[in-house]
Amino acid sequence: MKLSLLALVLGFILDLIIGDPHGLYHPIRLVGNLIGLLEKHMNKKSDSPDRQMVMGWLMALIVITLSSGIPLLLLLLAYHIHPVCGLVLETIMCWQLLATKSLKDESMKVYRKLKKHDLQGSRHAVSMIVGRDTEVLDETGVTKATVETVAENTSDGVIAPMLYMAIGGAFLGWMYKSINTMDSMVAYKNDRYLYFGRIPAYLDDIANYIPARLAGLLMVLASFLVRLDGTHAFAIFKRDRYNHASPNSAQTEAVMAGALNVQLAGDAWYFGELHKKKTIGDDIRPVEAEDIVRANKLLYGTAVVSLVIFTLVKYLILMF
């Protein structure tokens, strides 16, 4: 277990330095391909709602079993060959399961387009990291969408997998990512996924329940450390962290809104339909492109604080 903890630290460092290199096939794509293949054959529109839910549950079972079982077998084999082999493989897995640098890189692409006043380019850049319709967004809308996705993915893409890996190594990290990837692909409330995606959505809500709240609190702490408005961040966290259809998504969005002294969320277009949504935060000042830079500063601060706390707690547990 100490080697798994070391692998997490090394994997985090690799993520900060390398991120997701272009041209390198990401293992999460294999999980996505598996989900797409199973959904294509198992999600039949002609099926009854009950059968669609059963098939969604079966798909989730298959995806979770394969996505975590295969890495576990590979790790057991590698550690059996030699502890160093196991450490190297688990470090690579931990690196691939974290998304700190890639989240910053993708959001900064939007920032650079906004600074050039390239609205069409910024819409395209933000469409790569959000699920909403981006062609209707103005510059403020693009900026808000980017800040929101940095906030939400601070939990989903960094803190949650980090927490699960601190608890159970890369094996548990893969289990979490398989659930989270299913949620991002099939947990939509439309005709195609309303019933089929319900179980994956529930599983994601459960898997993120504790990590999202912990991420929110850690983000409040980090907001003080990176010299943002930590006091207001905590106030908005307490007030607005349930202003979302998801029980988890607004936890870190509320902290981000408070730390930046801006208002996030609100109505958004998805698949050509306007969805009425509550706002998060106070409209103290207008959202601006520089908020993307500030959001990334808070992302990195939260990631470092979380790693230090998680590894320290796990190390003390292993010692005693």
Over which residues does each language-model region extend?
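Glycine-rich phosphate/dinucleotide-binding loop and adjoining beta-alpha-beta core of small-molecule
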Residues: 184
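Hydrophobic alpha-helical transmembrane segments
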Residues: 1-175, 179, 187-320
